[in-house]
Regions:
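Intrinsically disordered, low-complexity proline/glycine-rich segments
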Residues: 2-175
Length: 175
């Protein structure tokens, strides 16, 4: 019942994982554009700050108090489009795998297990896996709010990394 009450504030419909759920705006990637990520209760919990006037696309993920928790940055001069993520001591590189019809992204995590994002990335219907186990799901179907999509994370310890990966994947998919 508590999950239903929490989810109701952001227009949340059915979802599958037991962890925290967040709402993100759909078309978020104008450089210099900032937006808030809200939790299931509608609280502003993270801010994505699109840095303008940079040579490469950069987004800063901040907590509700304005503290930087992650930097997501386009990696220039590589064969394939890539974005790097720095979240505290965690460093990761997100890049698109060119196989098949469906979108697949690989997230190489330094010193940790790599992640995979696959599904319909452009329509915000995909999941993120670690070692074959789903750690997050991204879906528009849960929300009644127009131009928004939900991100549900299985383990609260993965929230910052998953949200940063979601920002990077979205930026690469809509580049």
């Amino acid at each position: 019942m508590l999950a239903e009450a929490k989810g109701h504030a952001m227009g949340l419909r059915n979802h599958r994982l037991d962890g925290p759920t967040f709402q993100m705006r759909e078309k978020i990637f104008a450089i210099g554009d900032d937006f808030w990520i809200e939790d299931a209760a509608g609280n502003k919990v993270f801010k994505v700050n699109g840095k303008a006037l940079r040579a490469r696309e950069t987004f800063i993920l901040e907590d509700a108090h304005g503290n930087e928790v992650s930097k997501i940055q386009e990696k220039k001069l590589s064969v394939r489009d890539k974005m790097t993520i720095e979240s505290g001591s965690t460093k990761a590189t997100v890049h698109k795998r060119l196989i098949g019809i469906r979108d697949h992204y690989t997230i190489e995590v330094e010193g940790g297990e790599d992640l995979k994002a696959h599904g319909n990335i452009v329509d915000h219907e995909y999941e993120i896996e670690r070692d074959g186990h789903q750690i997050a799901e991204v879906s528009k179907k849960w929300l009644r709010v127009r131009d928004s999509y939900g991100v549900e994370v299985n383990d609260p310890a993965d929230v910052v990394l998953v949200l940063a990966v979601t920002v990077a994947v979205d930026a690469l998919a809509h580049d």
